[in-house]
């Protein structure tokens, strides 16, 4: 199973820039999208269906033009869950889950902490999400969480860890949360195959950051440990300002009910 995660920074803008042609070429079985910035009634879903993704599910923020996540799939999932059921988490449309045969795939867009109020919201969201996932793993042991976590976990994941140590996205409490999340039964898929520095998924538009590779690895695919032996490949596809994360896992066989 080939899974891609992609923060599109606006699906309507992405469509105008050739998203469908790219999607056909990349040809994932499932693609998780973040920051779609659109309501379903603003989209022509037939373009996704014609590209082979007849099963597409959208979870938009209540605020138009903001946040939102989606999952597009070639095959029909057994079940789709929109959000967590916790109102304080779901009004911004930040996670959606699709359960397939033997594996559940989630598209996640964690909040950013652009100011003190948003940082407080982000930290509260992270705690609630941790509790939600702890319970979910007991029900669904084979879980893939793809998305934009808005956190650089280790110094290796950011171009200048010293100067950015007090910036949201690399704060000690954010990094500690990520460590605890991983230690609670998850694996960073990319780091299973690549331990080298300078592998980033986001670059500022300022000061030629992309050209100089002054980036941040904010996007992760985390898998539960039962899936670790099934992981075949994990890479960052540096094709956009928010790079794409791709993993291959061997086809699971256990049915999720």
What does each model-identified segment do?
Residues 64-80, 197, 209-229:
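Conserved beta strand-loop-helix elements of the APE1-like EEP
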Residues 1-51, 55, 61-69, 153, ...:
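N-terminal, active-site-proximal structural segment of metallo-dependent hydrolase catalytic domains
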Residues 85-86, 110-126, 162-166:
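Surface-exposed cleft-lining segments at the edges of enzyme active sites
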Residues 27-30, 47, 51-55, 127-214, ...:
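Metal-dependent phosphoesterases centered on the DNase I-like endonuclease/exonuclease/phosphatase
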Residues 40-42, 65-66, 114-116, 152-162, ...:
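Short catalytic/ligand-binding loop motif for oxyanion handling, primarily in non-cytosolic enzymes
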Residues 247-257:
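Single conserved hydrophobic/aromatic residue that forms the stacking wall/gate
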Residues 1-9, 102-112, 146:
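Active-site-proximal beta-strand elements of phosphoester/diester hydrolases
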């Amino acid at each position: 199973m080939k899974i891609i995660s992609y923060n599109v920074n606006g699906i309507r803008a992405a469509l105008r820039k050739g998203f469908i042609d790219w999607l056909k070429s990349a040809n994932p079985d499932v693609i998780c999208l973040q920051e779609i910035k659109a309501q379903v009634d603003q989209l022509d879903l037939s373009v996704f269906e014609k590209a082979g993704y007849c099963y597409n599910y959208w979870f938009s923020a209540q605020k138009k033009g903001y946040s939102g996540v989606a999952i597009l799939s070639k095959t029909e999932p057994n079940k789709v869950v929109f959000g967590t059921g916790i109102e304080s988490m779901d009004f911004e449309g930040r996670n959606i889950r699709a359960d397939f045969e033997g594996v559940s795939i989630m598209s996640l867009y964690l909040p950013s902490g652009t100011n003190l109020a948003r940082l407080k919201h982000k930290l509260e969201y992270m705690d609630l999400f941790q509790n939600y996932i702890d319970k979910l793993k007991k029900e669904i042991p084979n879980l893939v969480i793809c998305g934009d976590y808005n956190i650089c976990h280790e110094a290796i994941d950011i171009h200048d860890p010293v100067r950015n140590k007090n910036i949201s996205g690399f704060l000690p409490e954010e990094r500690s949360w990520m460590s605890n999340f991983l230690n609670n039964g998850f694996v960073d898929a990319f780091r299973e195959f690549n331990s080298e520095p300078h592998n980033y998924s986001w670059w500022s538009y300022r000061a030629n950051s992309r050209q100089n590779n002054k980036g941040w690895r904010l996007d992760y695919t985390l898998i539960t440990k039962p899936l670790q032996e099934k992981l075949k490949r994990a890479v960052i596809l540096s094709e956009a300002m928010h790079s794409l994360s791709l993993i291959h896992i061997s086809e699971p066989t256990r049915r999720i009910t």
